[in-house]
A protein has these predicted regions:
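Bacterial N-terminal signal peptides that target proteins for export
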Residues: 3-27
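Bacterial N-terminal signal peptides
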Residues: 26-34
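Active-site nucleophile-adjacent alpha helix/oxyanion-hole segment immediately C-terminal to the catalytic cysteine
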Residues: 45-184, 237-245, 282
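Non-catalytic membrane-recruitment/adaptor modules and adjacent regulatory linkers
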Residues: 157-205, 219-224, 244-250, 282-289, ...
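Active-site signature of cysteine proteases
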Residues: 205-314
Length: 314
């Protein structure tokens, strides 16, 4: 009997181990399905995303958030990491600040947070810790002037206390250059408001392509409006399978009489979320400066304000 009991014990152990293995495989499968579902849900804006806010928050909560270093002498760790948490909990909260030329970087930030929030947080943490870091194979080694300025910007609204966003906007402006920056390449105090931080259309296209790793196509220019007969129909079609950003003159919108404006230049980048039309009234819903906005204008005014239509592959 003793001899016969040993095989049954071995058989029980075998089946027990086999069951545990199967349960682990089932659990792992459910975990993969859960994460895949999270990414599908999070990817409503982009068809393919790299990471989710949940993954980014888990990483953020796992790191030391009290460390200081000499690379960024004016960055306060509590304000820096609180700002990163805000970016993850409210991805549309990025605020370029009053009177700055950061609006293009704000639009780019919205897109980055839709596609790779974990990459953003890891990049910012490494940049803070080491003074340099790479995002999507783009190496950032900020100048000393920029590193000293981050955390000191004042009278910019809530940007004053958002030290991560100050750092992010400044290093983007320091890294990417266009013809508007040719004579303002080196940062000096107050340059967040000058041509040093300005972004022309080609520079914006290049930033989006490099940071998101996706194809970008634009129509229009910095001075001449796009050769599009019916902007409304064009935008509706583009929104069907692309992410769309607009390069506009938003000062026109605030004029009482649009017909009196004879000359204008583009001043602002927005992320278009939807566009509808009832008779001659066109309603745009878009993101800019930390929130969604709705604007109702005529077809004539729509054509007048748009200088660039940027189509980004999902």
């Amino acid at each position: 009997m003793e001899f016969e009991s040993k095989p049954s014990g071995l058989i029980f152990a075998y089946y027990s181990n086999s069951l545990r293995t199967q349960l682990k495989l089932i659990s792992f499968t459910f975990l993969l399905l859960f994460l895949a579902n999270q990414k599908i849900f999070a990817g409503e804006f982009f068809g393919e995303i790299i990471s989710t806010n949940e993954e980014a928050l888990a990483f953020l909560n796992s790191i030391d958030q009290k460390k200081e270093n000499s690379f960024w002498p004016n960055i306060k760790p509590d304000l820096f990491y609180d700002n990163l948490k805000l970016n993850l909990e409210k991805p549309g909260s990025f605020y370029p600040g009053r009177s700055t030329n950061f609006c293009a970087y704000g639009a780019l930030s919205y897109l980055v947070m839709q596609k790779d929030p974990l990459g953003y947080v890891k990049f910012m943490n490494e940049l803070y810790e080491k003074g340099s870091a790479s995002f999507n194979n783009n190496l950032f080694k900020p100048s000393k002037g920029v590193m000293k300025a981050a955390g000191t910007l004042k009278f910019k609204g809530v940007l004053d206390i958002r030290h991560a966003e100050q750092m992010w906007f400044l290093v983007l402006a320091d890294k990417f250059k266009g013809y508007l920056n040719l004579f303002h390449k080196k940062f000096k105090e107050g340059d967040e408001n000058t041509f040093w931080a300005a972004t022309n259309l080609a520079k914006f296209d290049r930033m989006v392509s490099k940071m998101l790793g996706t194809h970008v196509k634009a129509v229009g220019s910095d001075l001449i409006k796009p050769w599009v007969k019916d902007p409304y129909s064009y935008l509706v079609k583009r929104l069907g399978n692309k992410v769309v950003s607009l390069y506009i003159n938003n000062q026109i919108i605030h004029k009482k009489n649009h017909d009196k404006i004879k000359f204008s230049i583009p001043t602002h980048y927005i992320i278009l979320k939807s566009i509808t039309r009832v008779d001659d009234k066109i309603t745009l819903r878009y993101w800019d400066y930390g929130s969604d906005t709705e604007m109702q204008i005529s077809a004539k005014t729509l054509k007048k304000i748009i200088f660039g239509i940027i189509s980004i592959d999902k």
